[in-house]
Design a protein with these regions (language model features):
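Bacterial N-terminal signal peptides
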Residues: 10-24
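Bacterial N-terminal signal peptides that target proteins for export
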Residues: 2-12
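Mature soluble binding/inhibitory domains
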Residues: 23-150
Length: 150
């Protein structure tokens, strides 16, 4: 009788272990790590970028698209060279310089160097700085500008 009780107890413990293991595997949650935030140093190095939208030329909105290469220095400065097409004309080798500011929540703003004729942008940093998604905040143009780390 004692042997039968011991055998039953061992079987019950083994079955409980198997069920617990199966339930734990089936319903396990993904590991989530705390985000450490962003800073100007999040953006460093070369990024390819493209922009698309509309530019106001002589009180008429015309398509304005382009692409280029930008370099972020990790300290709040960015310089770029780009090509664009607007309203049937195109241009290459155009410079753009700006300062940028990054908040700890990964919001970013780019402010064109005064007198450069460039636009200002606001947006967000995603994937630990691998991408930057922005929109033009300089009236009256409507552009999206997206960067991808090279």
């Amino acid at each position: 009788m004692k042997l039968r009780s011991l055998s039953f107890l061992a079987t019950a413990v083994a079955a409980a272990a198997i069920l617990t293991s199966a339930v734990r595997t089936q319903f396990s949650l993904p590991v989530v790590h705390a985000h450490h935030g962003c800073s100007n140093a999040t953006l460093i190095g070369n990024y390819a970028f493209s922009f698309s939208g509309f530019s106001n030329e002589n009180n008429t909105f015309v398509p304005f698209d382009g692409a280029g290469i930008a370099n972020f220095d990790g300290a709040g400065n960015v310089s770029a060279t780009f090509a664009y097409s607007s309203g049937g004309t195109s241009s290459t080798g155009n410079p753009y310089t700006a300062t940028y500011s990054v908040d700890s929540n990964c919001a970013v703003s780019l402010t064109a160097t005064p007198g450069s004729g460039g636009d200002n942008f606001a947006g967000a940093i995603v994937r630990d700085g691998d991408e930057i998604l922005t929109t033009d905040i300089s009236a009256p143009d409507t552009l999206t500008l997206n960067f991808k780390r090279q």
